[in-house]
Amino acid sequence: MNATNTDVFAQVGGLEARGAKMKKRGTRFLIAALAVLAIAGIGAVTGWAISPSATPGSIDVPQVLASTFSDQVPGSEGGGLGGGLPFTSAVGAFTDFMAGPAIFTLGILGIVVAGAVLVFGGEFSGFVRSVCMMVIAVSMIFVSSNLVKGILGGDHDAGPAEPSPRARFMAAVEAKDFARVQELIEARGAKSAADYVLAQLAVAEGLDRKPGARVVVGKAAGSMAMPPAALGFTPRGEAAYAIERSAYGEPRSSIAKQYQQEWNRKAATWWAMAGVAGIIGAILAAAATGFVGLAVSIRNRVKRVRDLLVMEPGAEP
């Protein structure tokens, strides 16, 4: 009877170990299910929140408008004696070379070598000594030109370089200074491109509700439906969408609608990813529930069997 009880207890112990293994496996599946469901939740929230921006992140400046501003720095064409002559650049390059580090190094070497020959070369002829003295004189000219340039600094009369008209215009655009940009492009051509840039600035800075800026935004929105050949440039989708959202409350041109459709596709992709992750998470959660339920069932059964065995006379606990 004791042998039988021992065998029964061994089988009960095996069932108990199997139940513990099922519980451990169910816990792992539950953790995996929670992780996948969290990913599904993130995908769903992203798909719900993702939408095209109603304000342009950066201002798109068409080349047809930027080209109306000169990129020449004021005074860079040259002036004074010799200004604009074809050989001016060559002369400037030569003078820069003569006052450069290579000539300075060559001058120092000439002074050192020729001086050493004069000091230690007493047996050399008078001609050689004359040549050495000439080398020293030329080398001193080279070195002195570099020293003078280093002391005076060179080009002191040039003053700080002024930005070109195009640089000033682009700086105003980057600063999103609506009034300054409007002032700079008043006398320029490319009216459609000018309205396009001003409308972006108005929307970006929240000025599109003011009367003057509102008119500009309306003109730019109306021109977005025109073909690029008629406009002279191709509007950027983000800018066209923001302008039309401000003017009409919805995109109307093909460019703005295409931009919105791209964002809708992105949102649909996130929703699809969330759906797939949700299905996988549900399967893992169901498997985890099954394993944990089986483990609980085995544990309850083992407990009942142990209780029955303990109640028998002579049974080993």
Curated annotation (Swiss-Prot):
Keywords of the record: Plasmid, Tellurium resistance
Function text: Belongs to the kla operon, which is associated with cryptic tellurite resistance, and IncW plasmid fertility inhibition.
InterPro entries cross-referenced by the UniProt entry: TrbC/VirB2
GO BP: any one term: response to tellurium ion
Protein name: Protein KlaC
One of the Pfam families matching this protein, by short name: TrbC
Organism: Escherichia coli
